[in-house]
Amino acid sequence: MRIMWYMARYHQMRVSDATIYRILKRHGVNRLPGKPGRRKVHTKRYNKQVPGHHIQMDVKFLTFIGKKGEKVRRFQYTAIDDATRVRALKIYDKHTQANAIDFADHIIEKFPFRIREIRSDNGHEFQAKFHWHVEDLGIRHAYIKRGTPQLNGKVERSHRSDGQEFYQLLSYKGDVDLEAKLVEWERFYNFHRPHGAHNGKTPYEALREKL
C-alpha cells in the first residue's frame, strides 16, 4: 500500500496494489528479511483525535558494531502523537530517568501543540523522578498495565518502521553521523512518508487538518 502511495505522490503514477505485489514477487522482494510471521492478535485500539491529548513514549534498544568490532549500545527515545502520528526521536548513550526527563523537555519544545498526557510502560526510566517531573509541568503521566504493550501500540509499530526502513539500511559510523541521520529520518517520517492511518497523508498533513 505504501509503495502505491509513493508512486502516486512523488512520481504521478497510478499503480494498483496487485500489480506492485506481482512485480515484487517476480523479483523475490515481496517479503522483508526478518522474523517469521506471527499470528495476529486482535486488540482494542485507542485513538485520541486532538493533537497532544495523548502522547505515547517508549525506548528502542539499539546495538551497532563499532570501528574496532566492539558492540555499541544506544537508546532511541521516541514520542508519538496519537491523533496525528507526528513523532520526535532522540538518541542517548544511556537508558536512564535523567535522559527520559531530558527527552520530555525536548518534546515539549519540539511539538507544535500542547501536550496533555504522556503514556509509557513501567520501565525504570519512567519511574518516580520522571513521573513527577512531567506532572509538575502540568502533563498527566499514565502507565500502561504490565504485559500489555498493545496499549502503546502506535509507538511500538513506529519502532518496527524504524527498524525496517531506517536502521536496516544504516551503516554505523559514529554517534555524530547517527544523530544527523536520525534527524533526517524523523523529518522524512513526519513530512514526507505516507501513513496508512491517514490514507496516504503524512503526519504533518494530518496535523494541519486537526489544528
Q: PLM features: residue spans?
A:
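RNase H-like polynucleotidyl transferase catalytic core
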Residues: 117-122, 136-154, 170-173
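An active-site-proximal beta-strand-loop segment
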Residues: 57-87
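Buried hydrophobic side chains on well-structured beta-strands
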Residues: 3, 85, 118-119
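C-terminal domain-tail junction helix/linker
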Residues: 128, 137, 161-211
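Acidic/histidine-rich, metal-coordinating catalytic segments
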Residues: 95, 113-127, 147, 199, ...
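Short small-residue beta-strand/loop micro-motif enriched in glycine and branched aliphatics
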Residues: 86-90, 142-144, 168
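Basic, flexible linker segments flanking DNA-binding modules
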Residues: 1-63, 132, 148-149, 202-210
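Active-site beta-loop-alpha junctions of metal-dependent nucleic acid enzymes
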Residues: 72, 89-113, 117
